[in-house]
Amino acid sequence: MQTKRLTTKPTHEVIAAIQALDLTSVKARLMDAELGEGWTQEYADSIEQAYKTYLTMLVKYQEHAEDIMLAKDVDEFWHTHILDTMQYAHDCEITFGNFLHHSPHRRTGTAAEAEKRSAAAALTRELYAREFRA
């Protein structure tokens, strides 16, 4: 199976664009106790960095992008980023050169799905360890 590339831009340019993203409005919404999650500034900042790291991993390891897993709060950050569709589309265009679709893993409850999730989790740990020597 051939995996669609997320971008044709040079990796270093995409990573620089990811790091330059202004996600202040995303964090503000997530810090709002009524509209968001009531996160602290410190926690929102840490999840913003984790989100940018996740996007970087997708670009650096495009051949595995469909299998790289993300933490629940990073996924929540991504969902909140997507809510402002115009800004998200703009951010995707300047960062990746195209729209980055969110395709959540669908749970079927089958043994095959559990095995695939387990393999994806192992791959994610391996790639993060390779990248960050953790």
Where do the language-model regions lie?
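Intrinsically disordered, low-complexity, repeat-rich regions
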Residues: M1-A134
